[in-house]
């Protein structure tokens, strides 16, 4: 069988580079290239895409829209990593763990929107609870997300890795203060929520890794539940996943059991944990913002779209 032809548009960015790293050693993939002079030439991009099986778009929103329009009806599958199409009904949403309908959309639709990193964590915690009838769609979620600085792209990486480094970069920094973070629309859309969560993203002085934490007051849930009930619902939801795993209960607060945001750095998996008590509990998702939060998820979607085992070429 001939190798699949894959074209990464925007391969010089953080996500594009990681996708390239994951695919460059695979014998079943041939990477199509574009010259530096032509990398922003829409006509050349479309011409190369015409010969590809898969096209990854690792571009800003406006540029992604322009390239999608230029590619038009060419038979290639497009996997877009921007926020441009994540709530579009005619695009597949690239989180196959949400159910067979999502996985089937990834297999059959021409266009696939790769989830945002923060959104991946939020949705992975919230969607199972909504589906199980535990969390009502109008629940007032408050969510924190701790991420490494690679999530800010090349500019932020440069800030954190420059010498001398600004004094304030040594401490965690909260952003998205206006509650208008660009990942909130897809969370509300995919989970079917009637209100967007309060969301507090925080960037810290480490390269990659993410911990998203969703707090729950049980008195506000749709039905009485215990920590064990919530854990069981999550275990059932992810029972068939090879990529998202649910940690055992009874995590102890000692040096061996602290939740570390960079625990899964340089991997493509995700671990869900439940902590707290029967009055107040927290559901956590730990993963790499560049892995399951970006390039790893994109490669997973490519594998599904090509009919390959979804974990092919991933680090788990």
Question: What are these language model-derived features?
Answer:
Residues 113-124, 175-184, 290-299:
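A glycine-rich, Thr/Ser-enriched phosphate-binding loop motif common to dinucleotide/cofactor-binding enzymes
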Residues 12-46, 137-140, 144-145, 149-283:
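C-terminal substrate-binding/catalytic lobe of Rossmann-fold NAD(P)-dependent oxidoreductases
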Residues 1-175, 275-277:
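N-terminal Rossmann-like NAD(P) cofactor-binding subdomain of oxidoreductases
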Residues 9-15, 115, 147, 208, ...:
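Short glycine-rich loop/turn motifs that provide flexible caps or phosphate-binding loops at active sites
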């Amino acid at each position: 069988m001939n190798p699949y032809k894959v074209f990464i548009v925007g391969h010089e960015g953080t996500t594009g580079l990681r996708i390239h790293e994951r695919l460059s050693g695979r014998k079943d993939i041939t990477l199509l290239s574009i010259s530096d002079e032509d990398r922003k030439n829409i006509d050349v991009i479309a011409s190369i895409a015409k010969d590809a099986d898969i096209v990854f778009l690792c571009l800003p929103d406006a540029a992604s829209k322009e390239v999608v329009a230029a590619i038009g009806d060419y038979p290639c599958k497009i996997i877009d990593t921007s926020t441009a199409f994540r709530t579009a009904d005619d695009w597949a949403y690239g989180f196959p763990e949400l159910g067979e309908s999502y996985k089937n959309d990834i297999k059959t639709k021409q266009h696939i929107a790769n989830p945002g990193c923060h959104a991946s964590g939020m949705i992975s915690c919230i969607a199972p609870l909504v589906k199980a009838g535990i969390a009502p769609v109008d629940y007032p979620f408050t969510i924190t997300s701790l991420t490494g600085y690679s999530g800010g792209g090349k500019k932020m990486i440069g800030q954190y890795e420059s010498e001398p480094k600004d004094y304030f970069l040594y401490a965690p920094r909260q952003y998205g203060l206006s509650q208008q973070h660009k990942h909130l629309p897809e969370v509300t859309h995919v989970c079917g929520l009637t209100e967007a969560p309060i969301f507090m993203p925080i960037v810290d002085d480490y390269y990659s890794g993410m911990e998203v934490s969703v707090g729950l007051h049980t008195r506000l849930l749709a039905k009485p539940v215990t920590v064990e009930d919530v854990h069981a619902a999550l275990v059932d939801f992810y029972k068939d996943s090879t990529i998202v795993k649910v940690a055992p209960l009874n995590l102890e607060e000692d040096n061996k059991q602290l939740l570390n945001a960079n625990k899964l750095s340089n991997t493509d998996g995700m671990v869900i944990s439940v902590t707290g008590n029967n009055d107040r509990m927290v559901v956590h998702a730990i993963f790499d913002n560049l892995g399951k939060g970006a390039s790893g998820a994109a490669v997973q979607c490519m594998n599904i779209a090509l009919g390959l085992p979804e974990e092919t070429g991933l680090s788990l």
